[in-house]
Regions:
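Mixed-charge, low-complexity intrinsically disordered regions
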Residues: 1-77, 83-146
């Protein structure tokens, strides 16, 4: 479904004013991660802070996200509940579990995200370090296409 159409459907059903939302897809394996969101397994995500543009703001609690599948179609809307920065080395078991991936363990999270972040940093000739800041975002699913 088109993102704007999904947003308008959600707004009308929930009496929401305004258009305070972001549109994005997960960077690695978007359809699998989207499925985890839609089933309630995934309630958090993370990104590498150094990859943000200097004028790019972090998400804020209360903002909405329209999440796209790999074909660019909108499939669900989440509402951000919490955003914080932490070092890669300080990611917690609780955050790894909320990300809902693999066996939900911290070791799985670190392995898969170290690989993914290193791929993102290839063009900069960098590798992730334990001190690199990670943007951790928690959210709740508020609307989905069946």
């Amino acid at each position: 479904m088109d993102a704007e159409k999904l947003w308008n459907e959600f707004k009308n059903k929930n009496s929401i004013d305004g258009d305070n939302y972001s549109i994005w897809a997960f960077g690695d394996n978007p359809n699998l991660l989207l499925k985890l969101v839609k089933t309630g397994e995934k309630t958090a995500t993370s990104s590498l802070y150094k990859l943000y543009n200097s004028d790019e703001e972090l998400s804020k609690a209360g903002e909405y996200n329209i999440i796209l599948n790999s074909k660019g179609q909108a499939e669900c809307i989440t509402k951000t509940t919490k955003v914080y920065l932490t070092k890669f080395s300080d990611i917690t078991d609780a955050h790894a579990y909320k990300e809902g991936e693999g066996d939900k363990s911290l070791s799985y999270w670190k392995n898969i995200h170290e690989r993914f972040f290193n791929e993102c940093l290839t063009s900069y000739n960098e590798k992730i370090t334990s001190d690199d800041l990670i943007v951790c975002e928690e959210f709740e699913l508020v609307y989905k296409v069946n």
